[in-house]
Design a protein with these regions (language model features):
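Short amphipathic alpha-helical segments embedded in low-complexity Lys/Glu-rich regions
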Residues: 16-21, 82-84, 231-236
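Catalytic core and acceptor-binding pocket of nucleotide-sugar-dependent glycosyltransferases
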Residues: 136-252
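Surface cap/lid and interfacial helix-loop subdomains adjacent to catalytic sites
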Residues: 68, 106-153, 158-162
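N-terminal anchoring/stem segment of glycosyltransferases
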Residues: 1-57, 68-77
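C-terminal catalytic/acceptor-binding lobe
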Residues: 201, 205-206, 225-226, 230-315
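Short catalytic/ligand-binding loop motif for oxyanion handling, primarily in non-cytosolic enzymes
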Residues: 23-24, 50-51, 88-92, 97, ...
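GT-A fold catalytic core of metal-dependent nucleotide-sugar glycosyltransferases
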Residues: 59-120
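Phosphate/oxyanion-binding active-site loops and adjacent basic polyanion-contact surfaces
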Residues: 1, 53-62, 174, 206-210
Length: 315
């Protein structure tokens, strides 16, 4: 809907994954009817990828992209804006100036993706594990498994972006490597976290495995990356004032139905099992709470309600 508002919904390609143990949802029909200008492609799992979802759910992204790029090899010649489905674009979104070169432009995620992030995790190692950890170089180990080096990550330290990407010269083989790489990174980091840190949350953010795999595979094929302000984004947990300065709102950063443990928030994780958010009284609590109104999360929730009412959607 937000792409339609800024005149780009005719370029939208939506890839939808159906696990091998589930039938394709009929609920998508009403969305497809609403946006005939967009392309919707359904992929039923025929490669037992569903068995990997217990390890890492985001693996379905490179899997679907691998299949789509195989079916559409000329996509390699296009600049492709790649993002999650929980994104809202604002009137300030404009990356037209960055489409016609070979540079891959990224949102700024340096703080939790870069080489510096890896090195700083030393500070969170359990005291009794410090000496053993000193014998390891986790960044070096992981980058070698993908096919690059620590040095490449260090050279590109300030352009270690992710979350939203404007990709160039990308093909099926690229997504196959990303698919394989994100499982390697996820499992390796989980092992490291169990060995050297108090818990998973204190260790490396292994849920970012696909972001590292995309980034490092760009460098593997000698691609250039640049973090640019035009792709800066607001988190759902950010103050609403930040939305005025960014072109993208990513509904991430909320981990519970209570933001900061106190005021109500729209938490997408509460609805993964099929609960209808529009029949959940909590949604109105979010909409009407004066504190929640100070955050981007409130804007995201109001946009959901607006679209539902505008098109009389059923969940």
């Amino acid at each position: 809907e937000s792409l339609r508002k800024i005149g780009h919904s005719d370029k939208a390609i939506v890839l939808l994954f159906t696990p091998d143990f589930r039938d394709q949802s009929t609920k998508w029909g009403q969305i497809i009817d609403l946006y005939p200008e967009a392309e919707f492609v359904f992929y039923k799992d025929v490669d037992k990828v569903s068995s990997l979802l217990g390890i890492y759910i985001p693996v379905l992204r490179p899997y679907c992209l691998m299949r789509y790029f195989k079916e559409n090899p000329t996509m390699k010649n296009n600049a492709v804006f790649y993002c999650d489905s929980d994104v809202i674009f604002t009137d300030g979104f404009n990356i037209d100036a960055y489409i016609d070169d070979d540079v891959n432009y990224l949102s700024d995620t340096n703080s939790y993706i870069s080489a510096t992030y890896f090195d700083n995790k030393f500070n969170d190692v359990l005291p009794e594990k410090v000496e053993a950890y000193k014998q390891r170089d986790i960044l070096d180990e992981l980058t070698k498994k993908i096919g690059i080096s620590r040095e490449i990550a260090e050279v590109n330290n300030l352009h270690s972006g992710g979350a939203q990407y404007l990709l160039k010269n990308i093909d099926e083989a690229f997504w196959k490597r990303v698919f394989e790489g994100c499982i390697i990174i996820r499992t390796e980091l989980q092992v490291v976290n169990r060995e050297f840190f108090k818990n998973e949350n204190s260790g490396f953010q292994s849920w970012c495995a696909d972001m590292w795999s995309v980034l490092w595979n760009i460098w593997l094929q000698n691609g250039e990356t640049k973090v640019i302000p035009e792709m800066e984004f607001s988190w759902s947990s950010d103050p609403i004032s930040k939305l005025e300065k960014t072109g993208i709102l990513h509904n991430a950063g909320i981990t519970d139905k209570r933001m900061g443990g106190s005021y109500p928030a729209f938490y997408k994780g509460a609805y993964h099992m099929g609960l209808d958010p529009f029949t959940d009284p909590h949604l109105q609590e979010v909409i009407n709470n004066e504190t929640t109104k100070k955050y981007c999360n409130h804007y995201y929730a109001t946009q959901l309600v607006e679209i539902k009412n505008k098109y009389n959607l059923t969940y």
